[in-house]
A protein has these predicted regions:
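Exposed beta-strand-loop-beta-strand "reactive/processing" segments of non-cytosolic proteins
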Residues: 61-112, 159-204, 249-281, 328-374, ...
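Feature responds to low-complexity, polar/acidic, surface-exposed segments characteristic
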Residues: 17-27, 541-558, 571-586, 594-624, ...
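Sec-exported extracytoplasmic/periplasmic mature domains
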Residues: 63, 145, 149-153, 323, ...
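Extended intrinsically disordered, low-complexity coil regions enriched in Ser, Thr, Gly, Ala
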Residues: 97-142, 149-157, 192-230, 271-299, ...
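Short, non-transmembrane alpha-helical segments in secretory-pathway proteins
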Residues: 40-76, 133-172, 222-255, 302-341, ...
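Second-shell loop/turn segments in exported
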Residues: 40-47, 127-135, 224, 304-312, ...
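Sec-dependent N-terminal signal peptides of Gram-positive bacterial secreted proteins and lipoproteins
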Residues: 2-29
Length: 740
């Protein structure tokens, strides 16, 4: 596609494993990823790809699907590539209002052939994708399989068993459409290739709405043969003999609340990823080794806190520092400081964000770096100058040990007050062949335990230069007590009993490597990245045996009850013996309703501010968050007490539902409603408007023309009515502010 010019640079954090299908947290400390993927834009004048070309490509993939769009409805951006992948991408997007509803889409094509890399589509009408769904998962799988055929050379792609959405803990509001996700991976000799997937999301109305393609397999690829592989039993014994577990704090990201939650867990050792199926060598971050890697001990970077670099920096001082810090040979480029801005991070700290550009012949590159205002220390930096300053290819490259020493020196120079909380890398270094640089991850240490999800990342060029620095220290007030952890021996035994091996092909991270090694990769209780809760001794994630789970039996509401059970809305210890006709308490009913309509987080934006709407529901009460969320939604009104253990009546449920729909203003005018029920006289006048609306909207059915206002609501009743409420919310678009 010809030569390209770099015009700008955008720092973006990227979830590599699942793309657009679901935002997942980092699965494990033993996944070798850079903390940030750098998107570099190229000049539009240097590419022959036009908007019309991209639109034509889209219409070829989806014939007639987007006929309601004109070419003027589409938008394009400049082409871009990544620091670790020079293939140029081209973005196409659209947004339009159709019959009063927003329609949105974004598409990315890549390479000379404009292969589809990602696709996301939000259609106007998704009513058929709500419960009860028009298409089953099996139906959707057939649709996904047919769409897969649109990609070239995918005949050998096989559907993958769903791995856990690790660390991704929320319930989907039932007012949102059902999306079935399928992941396909290429195979060779019947063996799956790791890190190569095509993920396809299909709405329950049959529309393909999400696609993500994670890297292509080169036509030059070579593969180990499977004929001489070692037996699985021998390798399993080898792994068990060298197996170890490690105690870790794990920061689990809660997406709806935008907060971190800390767990104390046992994890398998991160010193190896698998065993070569032919040689028996151990797979590490940087290739295969003959001896089993040893587990490293914690070695702090500093025994006590060092003085901050320059406390209380002013804007003027930051600008002058930037001119010096970012200085390059003026014959190579001219530095322009565009802006020094202030922002507050999630810890409440003020950061200076310095935006700058290097202007050089025929183009320029730009980025921003950040400085902590209170300490004057760099918290985020990426060396853009490497894009136009060529290093001496004949110069001797420093070793990994020398690079590590350089990285520590840079931290002492540019972020000294942080490093007493961090330790030397516990994992092997990473080497980036594209950028000719070493990458190091320095874990935070609390109570002598390394923290997964809070690391300092430093990259050092083979010439010894600082290529990147990233600090994102999390503010966590409460860390689980290590003294309450189950023994490491018990955790090791649990891991060992659950250990299984998966045969797969993996490619080493080398720029010129097209060879795939045959590797046995360990998995635990069905997941490569599983963990054991150190406080309970139980798996954080359990193997999905949903097809074998006991089902709830009921003559009229079995489907609704089991759907809520599958969605983790309804919690039942023994579904097979559960009596769904049991009257439900107000507390339990409120919990089910809110879990059905929200993402499952019931906290305040500012956790230091606590509210108590009822005297008997204090912050320590198990339903405190749910009750307070219901108050914020207007479902409940503050009062002296909330009768959490009292059974819920049908007229009370009607009021809650109408308040959820924000129709209480209309319902309050009870004198305008005529109730045609045979038992209308038994309905409390205060509830008359709510009952009338709930009945008219089909949320709560009458029973032989009797509303039975004071009768108790059963679990079965609530299941049926809650799913009807979810559909009403979707149709009336009244739920958007509930999804915290």
């Amino acid at each position: 596609m010809g030569k390209f010019k770099k015009l700008g640079i955008i720092l973006t954090s990227t979830a590599f494993s699942v793309g657009v299908l679901s935002p997942m947290a980092q699965a494990s400390a033993n996944v070798k990823d850079s903390p940030e993927r750098i998107e570099i834009q190229v000049a539009s004048t240097e590419t022959k790809v036009t908007k019309s070309t991209l639109i034509k490509k889209l219409r070829e993939l989806f014939p007639e699907k987007f006929n309601f769009l004109t070419d003027n409805d589409f938008y394009t951006g400049r082409g871009h590539y990544y620091n670790d992948d020079k293939t140029i991408r081209y973005d196409l997007s659209f947004q339009k209002t159709v019959n009063g509803k927003d329609v949105y889409g974004s598409i990315t094509f890549m390479g000379d052939d404009l292969d589809l890399e990602s696709f996301y589509y939000q259609p106007a009408n998704v009513a058929d994708a709500l419960y009860p769904a028009k298409y089953s998962k099996d139906d959707a799988q057939k649709i996904a399989q047919d769409f897969l055929k649109k990609f070239p050379n995918t005949a050998n792609y096989k559907l993958q068993e769903n791995d856990f959405d690790y660390g991704f803990n929320y319930t989907r509001p039932l007012s949102e459409p059902i999306t079935y996700s399928f992941s396909y991976a290429p195979t060779h000799n019947g063996v799956t290739l790791s890190n190569h997937t095509i993920s396809i999301g299909v709405l329950a109305n049959g529309e393909v709405v999400q696609v993500y393609r994670n890297s292509n397999v080169s036509k030059k690829a070579t593969f180990d043969g499977v004929e001489q592989k070692k037996s699985e039993a021998d390798v399993l014994a080898q792994v068990r003999d060298n197996f170890a577990v490690e105690l870790r704090y794990y920061l689990d990201y809660n997406y709806p609340s935008d907060k971190r939650e800390v767990k104390l867990v046992y994890m398998p050792t991160s010193s190896f990823y698998g065993v070569h199926a032919l040689t028996g060598q151990w797979q590490t971050a940087n290739g295969f080794v003959a001896q089993a890697p040893s587990v490293k001990g914690v070695e702090k970077l500093a025994s006590e806190q060092l003085d901050p670099r320059k406390p209380g920096m002013t804007v003027e001082e930051v600008e002058e520092f930037a001119k010096s810090f970012l200085k390059v040979d003026p014959d190579k480029a001219k530095l322009q400081i565009e802006m020094v801005d202030e922002r507050e991070n999630e810890n409440g700290e003020t950061l200076y964000s310095v935006s700058y550009m290097y202007m050089y012949e025929n183009g320029g590159s730009g980025a921003s770096f950040e400085i902590n205002k209170a300490t004057g220390e760099i918290t985020q930096y990426y060396d853009v100058s490497r894009d136009f300053v060529q290093s001496d290819s004949k110069a001797e490259k420093i070793t990994k040990d020398a690079a590590l020493a350089k990285a520590i020196d840079y931290l002492k120079e540019w972020a000294p007050s942080y490093i007493h909380n961090y330790a030397k890398p516990l994992e092997d270094y990473g080497y980036d062949n594209y950028g000719n640089q070493y990458g190091f991850s320095f874990p935070r240490v609390v109570n002598g335990i390394p923290v997964v999800g809070d690391e300092i990342y430093v990259s050092v060029g083979t010439d010894g230069s600082l290529r990147g620095l990233n600090i994102n220290q999390q503010k966590i007030d409460n860390w689980p007590s290590v003294s309450k952890a189950v023994s490491a021996d018990k955790a090791k035994e649990t891991f060992s009993d659950a250990l299984k091996l998966k045969l797969q092909y993996t490619k080493q991270d080398k720029e010129d490597s097209n060879h795939y090694d045959l590797v046995y990769a360990p998995s635990y209780e069905g997941s490569i990245y599983n963990q054991i809760d150190a406080l309970t001794g139980k798996w954080v994630s359990s193997a999905d045996d949903s097809n074998n789970k006991p089902q709830i039996s009921h003559p009229t509401a079995a489907e609704e009850l089991n759907y809520l059970l599958a969605q983790n809305v309804l919690e039942v210890k023994d579904p097979a013996s559960f009596n769904a006709d049991t009257a439900i308490t107000k507390g339990e009913a409120l919990k089910i309703i809110l879990k059905s309509l929200t993402y499952g987080y019931y906290g305040y934006g500012n956790e230091e501010e606590t509210y108590q709407s009822f005297n008997n529901i204090d912050p320590k009460h198990p339903l405190y968050g749910i009750v307070e969320q219901a108050v914020r939604m207007g479902v409940l009104q503050p009062a002296d007490e909330f009768a959490v253990d009292a059974t819920l009546t049908r007229q009370e449920l009607a009021e809650w539902f109408i308040r959820v729909l924000r129709l209480e203003s209309a319902a309050k005018h009870n004198d305008i409603y005529k109730l045609n029920f045979a038992d209308a006289g038994s309905i409390d006048p205060a509830y008359a408007g709510y009952v009338a609306l709930a009945s008219a909207m089909g949320l709560i059915d009458a029973q032989q023309n009797n509303f039975n206002a004071t009768e108790k609501v059963s679990y079965a009743d609530l299941a049926v009515s809650t799913l009807r409420l979810a559909r009403a919310i979707h149709e009336n678009n009244t739920g958007r502010n509930y999804f915290y």
